[in-house]
Amino acid sequence: ETDGTAADGGESGNGTDEPDPVGDDSDETPVSIAAELRQMATSSRALFGTAFTVAFVAVLLYGVYYRGLLTFLPDVLAESPALAPVELLGQTVQPSQYVYTALLTVGIGGQYVGGRLTDRVPSRTAFLGFFAALSVLALSFPLVREVGTVPLVGICLLLGFFVYGTAPIYQVVVSEEAPDEVQGLSYGFTYLAMFGVGALGASIAGFVLTNATSAVLFSVLGVVAGLGALTVVALRRA
């Protein structure tokens, strides 16, 4: 004989028609968050206990250079006598705007070359070379700016090439220096350095331009890139 209660399926195991209560998991949320924070702290300690720390500093310096250069470069170019506004067909043309656009366009090629370069040479070597180029270009800019239009346009194109070409190189460096189990976290910290702390570059550039000249600004940027190159040298020895 079949049990009637089992046959009609109307009663739950507690002897009533009510469904079994589902446990309240609201208390699990704080526990889960706390566990996640502990895991993140542990992973961060493991990450910064490696050569990634040195790479992190190098990326931070690159971020300062990147933002310090590109934030105010349009204004610096607009004030350059070699790129003074001209009248064309009754319209005022700003050559500085076209030069800056060309700089950004050349940066596309720089990113491609930078990425390809890491397939041919060690990423640290490429990183060092690009930092050195950025330093030389920044220190040379005030002098080249006074020479004439063609040299000024040329150095702007070189700046665009190298400043954007550095991006894929540092990404490869980060991937090589971070342990496999914290690769994702390493990119989070890297972009914090690049676009978070590195954003101080815009503030530094603004302060320098307010209290000094554009020549001083490019000297500061040259020093920043030089420090980046020294950091990569330390990374190669790590």
What are these regions (language model features)?
Residues 175-214, 221:
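A late C-terminal transmembrane helix in Major Facilitator Superfamily
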Residues 120-173:
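C-terminal transmembrane helical hairpin of 12-TM major facilitator-type secondary transporters
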Residues 95-107, 134, 159, 194, ...:
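Transmembrane alpha-helical segments of major facilitator superfamily
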Residues 71, 75, 168-177:
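Intracellular helix-loop hinge segments at the cytoplasmic ends of transmembrane helices
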Residues 217-238:
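Multi-pass alpha-helical transporter architecture, strongest
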Residues 46-115:
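Extracytoplasmic gate region of multi-pass secondary transporters
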Residues 2-55, 83:
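Juxtamembrane intracellular "pre-TM" segments in multi-pass secondary transporters
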